[in-house]
Amino acid sequence: MIVKTNVKLNLGLSVLRKRADGFHDIETLFVPCYDFGDTLEIITGDDYSRTSAALFAKYDAPAGHFDASTSSATDKLSDWQEALVGGPVEPTELSESAKDEEKGAALPGNVAASYDGRLVQGISEDGKLMITIAREEGVDWNPLKDLCAKAYNILAQDFDLPPVKIFLEKEAPVGAGLGGGSADAAFTLKALNELCGLGLDDQRLSEYASKLGSDCAFFIFNRPMIGSGRGEVLEPYDINLSEYEIKVLIPEGVAVSTAEAYRGIVPREGLPSGRSDRLGEQKCLPEDPGASECHENRRIGGQPVNSTGMLMVGGHCQNKIGDPVEPTGMTDLKDVLAMPVAEWKDNLVNDFEATVFKAHPELAAIKQSLYDSCAVYASMSGSGSALFALYKK
């Protein structure tokens, strides 16, 4: 089975309070975005599909054949390793932390091997899972710790799953606040449910997904949803943005960790009401005096957006960040979303911008540049670094 995943955007993101369990309660509107996505293939049995073979060829790696049904995984590793990397590879300890094991998300690990840094493979200790991850920019994480592997494992705790091979080509940006990894996990759950005839409905799948990540459950439903709690409490929400074109921009060389984004953020519950937790005015000063005007070709910060919608930041914008304006207390997201889109600029806020923009002022410059290019609304998605803008068609 082959599926194409998608990512998400956040329309507004309020950090409400810190909970006793260390997580934060949030409120946001998740919206599917199909501009980016990964390619996921799951195969039961021993055959390699035409697609998986093409994946190995694309990354100039010889496809190794792994048969999990005839002997122990350890006995078969040497041939597989030699086929993959041209020689034996030392086994790597892949066990998760005790905290993850308590969550039931850990996958007993046996071996991970890498080919040229762009394609990695891992085999579970029991030999039932082989996972291959490929990415042009390189894969610097262990495949057996990937959320796709954890999705298989969490279902395997309750169901007798057959041996499978998972092939994942990462094409969506990593560390951009678009939820690409969470989407991979959710689509893995859905694919395994169908392939293995588990008969789980979306509600049950979302319960498994919520154990893997705060925004994983959204991708089970994959329609506009208001997320609360950690993001796993979902409520359908009807919104019509058909009058607007949405541009998603991925700044080059800027990745933001969620932990970094939360560092220094002040939850809204402890703030006075009626004010907003946003940075003050940001001004973009383009090299071209006319670049900040509205242009039909939508030059962003003096630079045209390329054909993929990506903005490569080249220093044309000089950012000037004023003092943060007074922070805001609790607001009702539905009330804000009901406003005309033209009023969202001053009311629909991503609270992470306050901390992330301080650490990465170039993102503030890009956001201002989006408004300079006639965007009706612009925001960072999730904890960044991706930004998006709505333009009137």
Enumerate the language-model features and the residues they cover.
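ATP-binding N-lobe of GHMP and related small-molecule kinases
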Residues: M1-A176, E194-Q203, I239-L241, P251-V254
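Conserved hydrophobic/aromatic beta-strand scaffold that supports enzyme active sites
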Residues: I2, T39-E41, P224-I226, I246-V248, ...
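Residue-level signal for inorganic ion chemistry
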Residues: L11, L40, C148, G181, ...
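Solvent-exposed alpha-helices and their adjacent loops that cap or buttress functional pockets
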Residues: P32-C33, S210-K211, A217-I220, Y237-S242, ...
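Glycine/serine-rich anion-binding loops at beta->alpha junctions
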Residues: W141, F167-C196, S214, Y377-Y391
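Generic non-transmembrane alpha-helical segments
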Residues: K150-D158, R204, Y208-K211, T355, ...
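Contiguous, small/hydrophobic- and glycine-enriched helical/loop subdomains that border
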Residues: A185, L189-I226, V233
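Conserved, helical-rich catalytic subdomain that frames metal- and/or nucleotide-binding sites
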Residues: F221, I226-Y377, K392
